[in-house]
Amino acid sequence: MSNEDRKDFNAMLARDNGMPKIQVVTDAATIAKYGGERMYLAPPRMYDEIMKSVPFGRIIPLGAIREYLARTNGADFTDPITAGIFVSIAAWASFQRSGSETPYWRTLKAGGELNPKYPGGTQAQRLKLEAEGHTIIQRGRKNIRYYVKDYEKAMHTLI
């Protein structure tokens, strides 16, 4: 995100923008890709609440959060674009406020990948995860990415 220092992420987190809601999609490719036509749109604070539930030493991929929200709200899938935006908003909102911290660094991208859009980028996320006992590995030579090693073993389960 650009101009993070000028944005009020806590105000963005509080806005519901008409969500939550279920939207029926009609595009055949989208239905085939996600396995259904009922797309759940969750407000940013729902992502924040789930991110806050991940305990010390555990991690959760964004995909697991999306699956949980769809399953518990009678939908086939959640919107992947807003999900990515809303976890970034939750991270930056936590970074901007004092108290009531959201442990955003525990929410990973697919495959256990660290999120470069979080405050401080992948290096800050790496330090926080290593402080919780995780091992971070680097992949790639030109397009370097960082991952939590054996992330599946540390996954938090949403019930």
What is the predicted role of each segment?
Residues 2-159:
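Nucleic acid-binding interface residues in structured DNA/RNA-binding domains
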